[in-house]
Amino acid sequence: MYKMQLLSCIALMLVLVANSAPITSSSTKETEQQMEQLLLDLQLLLNGVNNYENPQLSRMLTFKFYTPKKATEFTHLQCLAEELKNLEEVLGLPQSKNVHLTDTKELISNMNVTLLKLKGSETSYNCEYDDETATITEFLNKWITFCQSIFSTLT
């Protein structure tokens, strides 16, 4: 009788240990580098948008972006991935006039690759978006804050 309870207890303990096993250090290091790259790309885009020489900023601010209600986990990166196409279109407006945003397509492409590495190929996560939309600067700032938060937990 006690043997069955002991085996059940051991099985439960093994499941708990397996589910809470830490990521290997090389995997953590790679994730840190990918998060840092994503953070740098977002900051670069924000700097280009906020550049005082950007004649299209007022026009860019009229476009609205969706942000998740609460972005706290890697699965929320799916929400960013879903908005990247819209971001690329808006950032493409001033390309001919704004030196700081000339490599938009390459940056967005790099971000897509980085996001795929970070979140994996799993796309079944459905984003719950905030009721209010965000301007391009609010959108970028929110994702920068998210990346900084995740990055700080990794280091």
From Swiss-Prot:
Keywords per UniProt: Adaptive immunity, Cytokine, Disulfide bond, Glycoprotein, Growth factor, Immunity, Secreted, Signal
Main localization, broad class: secreted
Disulfide pairings: C79-C127
GO CC, any one term: extracellular space
Domain of life: Eukaryota
GO biological process, one term: positive regulation of interleukin-17 production
Any one Gene Ontology molecular-function term assigned to this protein's record: growth factor activity
Cellular compartments annotated: Secreted
Gene field: IL2
Protein name as catalogued: Interleukin-2
Job of this protein: Cytokine produced by activated CD4-positive helper T-cells and to a lesser extend activated CD8-positive T-cells and natural killer (NK) cells that plays pivotal roles in the immune response and tolerance. Binds to a receptor complex composed of either the high-affinity trimeric IL-2R (IL2RA/CD25, IL2RB/CD122 and IL2RG/CD132) or the low-affinity dimeric IL-2R (IL2RB and IL2RG). Interaction with the receptor leads to oligomerization and conformation changes in the IL-2R subunits resulting in downstream signaling starting with phosphorylation of JAK1 and JAK3.
